[in-house]
Amino acid sequence: MVRLSTKPPNPKVEMNLKEPPITGAGAGAAASPPAPSTLRRNPPRSARPPPTPLPNSKPSQISRLLEEAAERLKVFLRIRPLPLPERKGKAKSPTNPKQVCLVANSPNSVALTVPHSKLLDPKRGRTEVFDGFSSVFSPDSSQHDVFSQVMNPLVDDLLLGGKSGLLVAMGPTGSGKTHTVFGSPRNPGLVPLTLRRIFSPTTHEPFSKLRSFCFSMFEILSEGKGERILDLLSDATDLVLQQSTIKGLKEVSVENFADAEALLFSGMLKRTTAATNANSKSSRSQCIITIRAVHKSSDAESENSLNNAVLTIADLAGAERERRTGNQGTRLLESNFINNTSMVFGLCLRSLLEHQKNKKKPLEKHFKNSMLTRYLRDYLEGRKKMTLILNVKPGDDDYLDTSFLLRQASPYMKIKYTNLEDSSGLVSQKRSSASLICQENTKKRKIHKVAGKDDIDKDDGVTISEKDESQYKLLNSELRRVSRNEEIMTNFARALWTVLKQYKQKLLESENAVESTRELLRSKDIKIMELEKKLKVLSCSCKKFPAVEDTFVEQNNDVSSGQVAQSFVSLSSQTDLVSIDSALNKSLAVEEVSEESTGHGPERSSDYDDKTGTGGSDVCDTSIIKLIAEEELCSGDCKPEKASSSDAFIPEHDVEKENIGIVVQVLDKKLDRSESCSDGGGVTHSSSSLDHPSDQSFTDTCLQNESANLSPQFIGASKKSPIEQSEEEREEIHNITTEGIQQNVHTRGVKHHSTPSCSQEVNSGSLHVSSSQLQGMGALQQDPQSERCKPTVEITIVEYGCAQPPHVVDDHGGMYPCTLNGKSSPRKAPISPTKDNQAEKLTDKIEDLSASKPCNRKNTRRRLQPVSAMMLKEFTGPDIFVDTRKEEKVKSSRDAMGRSDKLIRLLTDHPPRARGRAQ
C-alpha cells in the first residue's frame, strides 16, 4: 500500500528540476548544483513461498479408509408451503419478513428472521442463519425431489449393499411430516415411492429375483401414563418389545407393489388420529414401517449379507404446545407422551455426539426412557446409518416452534457413523497383505472361538430345554385348571338356566290363576247384583206397596201436597185401623210432610193457588211416602190384609188441553161386597160401580172422621179460606175462576145412637179395597172396646175448587168449620139450625140429583186444578156419586159452577138426615 503526503511542493526545487544543466565556460563560473532530492517509498514485500510436499509422502491407507468410513448424519430440511387461507391478501413475494420468518438462502442453509411482534426493539432486526444441512427443500419442491435425495441412497444400500437404514421425520405438529412420509393417492409420499422402487426390477439389480421382502407396520401410543404397541396389520394386541425386536409382530411377505400398497393403506386407516386446535388430523402415535429383505438362495455369503438388511421409516408425532392446542384430559396425556418421546430422542442424539467428541465420556443410556428409542437403539448408538428429515412451517406464528427445532437439530449434523457392520471387508483386505504367521495365528484363534461357541451353544440348548420342560409342565397344569373351571362354570350356567325356566313357568301359571280368579269374582259380583235386584222386588211385594216405578201419575211439572197425602192415604188404607190415636198420629205425620212439601207451611201453597188458580204445588219426594208407610206397617198391632190385585192407571192425555187433569180410574169396575155398620149393629152388603150414577156410602161416622184426619188437604183448606163467606163473595170467586172446573163434594155422615160408629173414606185413586178388608173394618166398628168412636154424627163438607172451608153440622143442626186433630177455628157459632125432617128432605134431593142423568158438556180446555180440587177428587167418598169422565165430556165449566152452587145452598139450608131413618 502506498501512502501519499498531503503537503504542497517547494517552488525552488521545481525550478531546479525544470532548468536544464549548464555546460561550457558558464558552468565553471557558476556554482555546482546541489544533489537532487527524491521521495521515499516502502519497498515491495514478497510473500513466503508455500511449503512444497515431500516427493514420497502419501496419506496412509488406514486414514483414508477411516475418512471414508466416517460418514456424517444426513439432515434434510423441508419447508412447508403456507396454507391457502394465509396466502390470500398477502404480498406476492414469499420472502416478506413481515409474513414469512424462514427463508432458504442456499441449497444448504436457511435464514430465520424474528417477527416484529417478537422483537423488543422494532428498529433493530435480528436474523439467524442455519447452515450445514444436507439439502433444503423449498415450499415449491415436489415429493419426487425429496425421494430422489433422501430415500434413493437408503434404498440403494438396502438393495445393492445389504445395509440397514433409518429415516426419521421430525417437526412440530401440522408441519407436514405425515404428508411427506405417506402422501396422498394423487401425490404419493416416500413410503409408496420406496415400495414402487423396490418392486420394480432393473438391470443393475442382479439379486432382485433371488430375494423377497417382508412388510410390517405398527405404532407406539400412550396408554394412561404408560405406552403400548399396536400392530396395524392385525388385531393382535399382545406385542412385547424385547431389546430391539418386537415379539408377536406380524410380518407379511409381499411379492409385488399392489399387495404392499394395499397393506400400507389398510394400516393407515387403523392409525390413531385426533383433531386439535392446531391440526384437524393430528397423529397421536409414533408410526413405524419396516421392510426386511430375505434371500431365497442357500448361499451362505449372500445370506449373511442380506439377513439383517432392514429399511425402517418412522413418522414421529409432532411436538405440541399446550397453549396453542388447548388439549385437555386424554388429549393432554397424549401431548405429554408425544413431547416426552421427542425429548428423549433428541437427548439420545446429543449424548452420541458428545461421546464422539470425547471418547472418555461414556454414552448415556437415555434410550431406556422411551419405547421408541429402545427399538431404535442401534441407530441412536451409531452402529447403523440414520437419516433425518425436518419439517417446519415458515409462518410468523410458528416462529417459536421453528427456531426450537433448528437449534435442537443443528448439532446433529456433526454426528458421524463408523459403520462397523461393513468393516469386516476392509479387515480381510489387510489380512491378505500380512505375514503367514499372522494368518496362522488368526486361523487358530478363529478355530478356538468356533469351538467355544459350539460349547456355549450346547450349554444354552440344555438350559433352554430344561426351561422349556418346566414351562411346559407349568402351562399344562394351568391348562388343566382353566379347563376344569370352564367345565364348572358351564354346569353352573346350565343349572341356573333350568331354574330360571322353572320360575318362569311358575310365574305364568300364577298369572293365569290370578286372571281366572278375577273372572270368577266378576261373575259373582254380577250374580250378587241380580240377587239384590230380586230382593228389592220381593221386599216391595212383601210390604204391600208397589215400587216407585209402578205408580204412574201424570202432572205438568210438579207434584202437589194433595198427591203426597193421596199416596199416604192409599198406603194407610191397606192397614187395619186399630184406634183413633193411631189415626191422630198419622194425621200429624201427614201434616208435617205436607208442610215440608208445600214450602214450610200452608201460606206458600195458598199464595201459589191465588196466583195460578190451579192445583199445582211443589214436588214432593216419593221417598217420604215410603218412609211413612213403613212406619205405619211397623207400628200397627195387626198385620195388613192382602189387598186385591188391581192396578191404577192414568187416563189418556188430551193434547188440545193446556193443563193436565189427573184422573184415576179403577180397572176393576165391581168391588167386592163390603160390610158397613147399620142402625141395629148389623152388616149391610152393597155393590159399587163407577159407571153407575149413584153409589152407596159408608154410614160410619168414625170412618169419616178418620178419613178427614188422614187427609192434609183439609188443614190447608181450613187455613187458606175464611170461616164464613157470603153468597156475593162466592159468586165473585166463581166469576174469576170461570175457566177452571169446580166441584163440590159433600161427605155425609149418619148418626147412630145405639152403638159408636167409625167412618173411612175410600180414595178412588188408590188401590181397590177388598171385601176382606171391609169385613175387618166392620168388625172393628162393632168392637165395643173402641172408646174413641164418638156417638155423634159429624158431616164434613169438602169443597173442590172453591175457597170456602168445609163445615160440620153438630147435633142441634148448627154448622161450624171443620177441625182436624181437635183444633177448631175461633168462630164456633152455628150458621143455621136444622131439624131431622130437613135432613131427610135434603137426603132425598141428593139421591134424586145423583140418580138423574148428567147433562152433556162440551170439550173445554182445562188448566191445572188447585190443591183443594185435587185433594177432594182423590178423597171422594163412596156415597158421593160423580162420574168424572162423563162430566168432562158433557158439562161446561159454567154449568158445573152453577150446579155446585145450588148443591152448596141446599146443604147449608137443609142438613141431611140420617140414612137409617129414611130406611
Curated annotation (Swiss-Prot):
GO terms for cellular component: cytoplasm; kinesin complex; microtubule; nucleus. Residues 755-764 have a biased composition (Polar residues). Residues 72-415 form the Kinesin motor domain. It comes from the Eukaryota. Residues 46-56 have a biased composition (Pro residues). PROSITE patterns: KINESIN_MOTOR_2 (PS50067). GO terms for molecular function: ATP binding; ATP hydrolysis activity; microtubule binding; microtubule motor activity. ATP binds at residues 171-178. Keywords: ATP-binding, Microtubule, Motor protein, Nucleotide-binding. It holds the Pfam family Kinesin. This is Kinesin-like protein KIN-6. The gene is KIN6.
